[in-house]
Every structure is written in C-alpha cells, then in structure tokens.
Amino acid sequence: GPNIKNQECDLLVAVGMRFDDRVTGTPAHFGANAKVIHLEIDPAEIGKIIPADVAVVGDVKRSLPLITERIRKRDHSQWIAGFRACDQIEYEAVIRKAVHPAEGRIRMGEAVAAVARAYRNDAVLVTDVGQQQMNAARYFGFRRTRSVVTSGGLGTMGFGLPAAIGAKLGAPDREVVLFAGDGGLQMTIQELGTIFQSKIPVKIVLLN
C-alpha cells in the first residue's frame, strides 16, 4: 500500500526525515512523480538522498504551520479506501504466506505472528537490529498507539535488551516483548543480570 501510494503521489512533504534506505529502497524510484518539500532542522540532510524541490531548514514547530495553514479541507475517503484495498492485496500475496506454517522450518514472519496472536496484538513491541526488526515491524500488527520501541535509523545492534527493560519500567501494566537476533542480544546480554536482580518480566524472542 505505502509503496503504491508513494508512486502515485504528486506532492511529498517530508518532515524531519533523512530518507534512509529502509524507507526509500532505490532512491531513483522513490516518489518518482512527486515534487518534494523537505522540512529538516539539519541542513546536511537536505538533498543528500532525495533532491528537494522546496527545502525548509529549521524547527518544524515553526515551519510546518506555514504549510498546514494553506491546506484546504478535502474528502480523502476514496483515497483511504484505495489504501485499504492495497493492504488486502498485500496480505493475500505476501503476508499470508509469511505468517502461516511452512513445512520443515519456522519462518520469522510465522514466529512473529504467533507471538502477536498470543498477546492479542496488545503488547509493547521492542526490537533489536536486523532481519527480526524488519519482520517484527511487518508482521506483528498493532491495536494501540505508543506500542513500538525500535532504534529505527540509528541502526545500533544491542539496542533491544536495554530498551525492553526501559519499556517495561515505563509501562509496568503492559506485556513487553523483545525480538532480537543472537548477535545483537550478545552485545548487551549482561542486562539479563539487571532483569534477574530487579525482577523485570521482559519476554525475549530470539530469532536466528
């Protein structure tokens, strides 16, 4: 859905983003038909990956209202319906195959979906960095806001376990599930001692 709509759009407003490769894929194909307005506090990010037709350097708290105050209210129900239709097509073509059992092995998408079902998609999701991060983001599914903690563009392995501890301390009434790979987990594995000593009930799913 997002990829299709990205190719259809004629105006792309980028607010405080650096267009990293996990967002753009091949830069030449990203929003190929769109004019780009890039709002960013760091001038070094302007035009670094995606050329900007209009560049606005500064705090978006001040710059974004200059755009939004000029926008007229419109009915986007048809656009949203088209987006949802794309979601359904993607589910049938890609996601269904990834989350259902495969003979002889357990795929990452299948494991993520099984954990999501166990927690009724209501847990706080924390990820380390790697393929499990991508699979968790795609196949976990969410029902509530403020439910994802991930390093995003920082891309720092070892982020997951300390972040999961922090998430549980910040939301003690919610289950916290960490998806990690063996490399990232080992980088901060000493925090298992913190979990044991402080009795912090974080669930860890190791996907190798």
Region roles according to the model:
Residues 3-8, 198-208:
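Thiamine diphosphate
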Residues 1-84:
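Glycine-rich, acidic loop regions that bind phosphate or pyrophosphate groups
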Residues 87-167:
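Active-site diphosphate/adenylate-binding microenvironment
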Residues 17-20, 130-132, 183:
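Short glycine-rich anion-binding loops that position phosphate/pyrophosphate groups of nucleotides
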Residues 173-194, 207:
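DG-centered beta-turn motif at the end of beta-strands
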Residues 15, 39, 151, 179, ...:
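Generic beta-sheet signal
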Residues 1-37, 143-174, 188-190:
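Glycine-rich, anion-gripping cofactor-binding loops and their flanking helix/strand elements
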